[in-house]
């Protein structure tokens, strides 16, 4: 227990993040299955819309703050950044431990918020006046706000740690332009966290005082404006979605270049600039989430254009990945299957994003299932596919064990069918006008909702199969004899698994 509770070792802390993220992911998945069960047939299943919206809200918060971010930034980030930099550990190892241990209390607060009063049925955006005292009396929303505060502090500390580590602890020979793309993606992610989370903290703190201390930041009766909250929230919320996908970009770059048998990713400097551009542009497009609140036409025109510009650096990344794959004799290993699935499905999600960027079109599609389909393509098939690819790719390094390849391929096929069956029909529902965040719908929408629910059941079976595959690997203890990877990235020069202290002597990189 002492080793895990007080650990200052980036590998142990990374492992804790993985376990925590997997556990939270199971909770979040259970909530999503409840959502799909409710929508699997017309009529009610679990009760009124309040409980339904509590489930939807908790599903979003858990998947974002307690599954994707801990696994990508906490798990892969902690494990790989020091190894790829040739650094003995993170810059602030004890703060690293604290970043992790802020998360279980944060998750507990969120779960408790669902259990007191009527729960926080606000949606993950927590818009007032629905989230204000007038519509959500009781402590639920307050507890959810405190949960976000803790998760936010955790992420800010982690971000400071990663930025400091990369600035100060690069090994001799690793200049910024030669730094691995995954490390770049984590640094840019950390910068985004550092700049956006304080704004969220301000917004939810003002909401807290509106609810409890009689201020009126968001209450028109006292001269406030609920639209101010939306601006503040989305100034955080839009960078947040890039925070969720950028580490995935970094992992996919590594996996594609290694599986292609290439020395490096095509256009790696361009890839770095593309990620920097995405990070910068992510901060100046937030109001595209607010096309329906009545902004001036010139404001809408700006946010439409700026949003579409993000497609350019994203396109650079997609085509560079395709160029990296070009001309290779691929063996379809499980990791490359996930990476190829990522490139294809993330592109589909990106295309629906360009559709939604048009303010005039978005007036019709806003708050319909078209939006749900869009962001689940980039999250459930972008972020999650990247996590799967990365986990399978680096599992032999992390554990020194092998997974069952045949099963992993079957698992990929099951998941691929499941997620597409779940989310592709939601585009049709959205175009037909089915609104989000309702527990019931007119009968005309039944067919595609049934298809979607069947898809979610298939995905659930896939996830359970994945946990079985990991269990089987840990029980069988098939040791890795040597890493099959080309050593295009220095983490593969480690033992499998790496020693507790990887670089007691600092490496010198010459190339």
Curated annotation (Swiss-Prot):
Gene Ontology cellular component terms for the protein in this record: mitochondrial inner membrane; respiratory chain complex IV
BP-aspect Gene Ontology terms: electron transport coupled proton transport; mitochondrial electron transport, cytochrome c to oxygen
Cofactor note: Binds 2 heme A groups non-covalently per subunit. Binds a copper B center.
Catalyzed reaction equations: 4 Fe(II)-[cytochrome c] + O2 + 8 H(+)(in) = 4 Fe(III)-[cytochrome c] + 2 H2O + 4 H(+)(out)
Membrane topology type: Multi-pass membrane protein
Primary localization: mitochondrion
Xref: InterPro entries: Cyt_c_oxase-like_su1_dom, Cyt_c_oxase-like_su1_sf, Cyt_C_Oxase_1, Cyt_c_Oxase_su1_BS, Cyt_c_oxase_su1_dom
Binding positions for heme a3 per the UniProt entry: 374
Record cross-link 1'-histidyl-3'-tyrosine (His-Tyr), residues: 238-242
Entry's EC annotation: 7.1.1.9
Pathway the protein acts in: Energy metabolism; oxidative phosphorylation
Location relative to the cell: Mitochondrion inner membrane
Any one GO molecular function term: heme binding
Function summary: Component of the cytochrome c oxidase, the last enzyme in the mitochondrial electron transport chain which drives oxidative phosphorylation. The respiratory chain contains 3 multisubunit complexes succinate dehydrogenase (complex II, CII), ubiquinol-cytochrome c oxidoreductase (cytochrome b-c1 complex, complex III, CIII) and cytochrome c oxidase (complex IV, CIV), that cooperate to transfer electrons derived from NADH and succinate to molecular oxygen, creating an electrochemical gradient over the inner membrane that drives transmembrane transport and the ATP synthase.
PANTHER family from the UniProt entry: CYTOCHROME C OXIDASE SUBUNIT 1
Assembly: Component of the cytochrome c oxidase (complex IV, CIV), a multisubunit enzyme composed of a catalytic core of 3 subunits and several supernumerary subunits. The complex exists as a monomer or a dimer and forms supercomplexes (SCs) in the inner mitochondrial membrane with ubiquinol-cytochrome c oxidoreductase (cytochrome b-c1 complex, complex III, CIII).
Identification of the protein by name: Cytochrome c oxidase subunit 1
């Amino acid at each position: 227990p002492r080793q895990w509770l007080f650990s200052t070792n980036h590998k142990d802390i990374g492992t804790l993040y993985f376990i925590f993220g997997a556990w939270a992911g199971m909770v979040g998945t259970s909530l999503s299955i409840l959502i799909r069960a409710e929508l699997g047939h017309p009529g009610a299943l679990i009760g009124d819309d309040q409980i339904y919206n509590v489930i939807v809200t908790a599903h979003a918060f858990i998947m974002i703050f307690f599954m994707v971010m801990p696994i990508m930034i906490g798990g892969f980030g902690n494990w790989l950044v020091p190894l790829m930099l040739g650094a003995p550990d993170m810059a602030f190892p004890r703060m690293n431990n604290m970043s992790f241990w802020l998360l279980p209390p944060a998750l507990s607060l969120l779960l408790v918020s669902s259990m007191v009063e009527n729960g926080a049925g606000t949606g993950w955006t927590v818009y007032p006046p629905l989230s204000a005292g007038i519509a959500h009396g009781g402590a639920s929303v307050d507890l959810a706000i405190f949960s976000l505060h803790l998760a936010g502090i955790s992420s800010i500390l982690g971000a400071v740690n990663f930025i400091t580590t990369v600035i100060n602890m690069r090994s001799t020979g690793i200049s910024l332009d030669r730094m691995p793309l995954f490390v770049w993606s984590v640094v840019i992610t950390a910068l985004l966290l550092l700049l956006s989370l304080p704004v969220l903290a301000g917004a939810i703190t003002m909401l807290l005082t509106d609810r409890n201390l009689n201020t009126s930041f968001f209450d028109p009766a006292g001269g406030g404006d609920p639209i101010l909250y939306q601006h503040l929230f989305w100034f955080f919320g839009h960078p947040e979605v890039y925070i969720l996908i950028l580490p995935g970009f970094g992992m996919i770059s590594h996996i594609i270049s290694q599986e292609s048998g290439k020395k490096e990713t095509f256009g790696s400097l361009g890839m770095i600039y593309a990620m920097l551009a995405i990070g910068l542009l992510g901060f100046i497009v937030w109001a595209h989430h607010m096309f329906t609140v009545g902004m001036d036409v010139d404001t809408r025109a700006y946010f439409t254009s700026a949003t579409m510009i993000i497609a350019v650096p994203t396109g650079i990344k997609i085509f560079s990945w395709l160029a990296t794959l070009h001309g290779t004799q691929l063996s379809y290993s499980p990791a490359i299957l996930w990476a190829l699935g990522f490139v294809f499905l993330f592109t589909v999600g990106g295309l629906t994003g360009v559709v939604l960027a048009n303010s005039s079109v978005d007036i019709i599609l806003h708050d319909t299932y078209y939006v749900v389909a869009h962001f689940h393509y980039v999250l459930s098939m972008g972020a999650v596919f990247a996590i799967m690819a990365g986990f399978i790719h680096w599992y032999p390094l992390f554990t020194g064990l092998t997974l069952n390849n045949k099963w992993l391929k079957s698992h990929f096929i099951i998941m691929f069918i499941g997620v597409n069956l779940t989310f592709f029909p939601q585009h049709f529902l959205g175009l037909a006008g089915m609104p989000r965040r309702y527990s019931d719908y007119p009968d005309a929408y039944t067919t595609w909702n049934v298809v979607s629910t069947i898809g979610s059941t298939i995905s659930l079976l896939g996830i359970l199969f994945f946990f079985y595959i990991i269990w089987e690997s840990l029980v069988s203890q098939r040791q890795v004899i040597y890493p099959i990877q080309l050593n295009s990235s220095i983490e593969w020069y480690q033992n499998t698994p790496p020693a507790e202290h990887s670089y007691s002597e600092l490496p010198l990189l010459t190339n």
